[in-house]
Amino acid sequence: MAVAEPAGPGTESLNLWNRGLGTVPEEVWDRTGLRVLILAGNGLTGLSPRIAGLRRLHTLDLGHNALTAVPEEIGGLTGLTRFLYLHDNRLTVLPRSLTRLTALRYLNAGENPLTALPPDLGVMTGLVELRAQHGALTTLPESAGELRNLRELWLRGNRITELPGTLGALAELRELDLRENRLTGLPDGMAGLPLLRRLDLRANPLRRLPGWLAGLPSLEKLDLRWTGVGEDGPVVRELARRGCAVLL
């Protein structure tokens, strides 16, 4: 299928969203000047290693396809600094080379049956937002606490039973979505989240709330619906007294 988009030397953006491609036309890989490439919604099952030639890309959208793997060559796209969309595919793992994208700001790998995130995830210190919702994760790597610029972390709908205490080092974190997991508690190491505003814990089998929750200085909203936590606990009472919206 020919690509009916401008192909001049100055072309920097190519939008092939929902074209029913099945495979990526070879001529796409020849456009080495591309900065933005959108391939979402095409039923893609694989990608050519030739993607390595698109070194000027800062945004790549591979969402809503049928990918079971992403080639390791993606790690060579070190100009990929803005957005990488991998959501709604069939990925069980992410390529290890992904962590070479240390300046990437936004990564959406949600809606995949991911069983783990890369163990050295923490080197991706440019990340401001990380989405890995609706997968098969049971925990996070310890290195996640090194994502020093992370502001939003979305982990809804996984199988997470425990979290590393290193998350308490995420000094820029504003929003943490943990709803619909299997958490029975939170580690004390998470007490150091000075900017956390919204914490969603709904639909987790929580046994108790740690006392440090009441001491989070910026917390504005805590969602505890469908957790079994009652309104008569000291943590809930203290948060409510401070003006934090606690949903039960």
Language model features: what each stretch is:
Residues R198, A203-L248:
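Leucine-rich solenoid repeat scaffolds
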Residues E111-L201:
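Eukaryotic tandem repeat interaction scaffolds
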Residues V24-E27, L47-R50, V70-E73, L94-R96, ...:
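The feature encodes a structural signal of leucine-rich repeats
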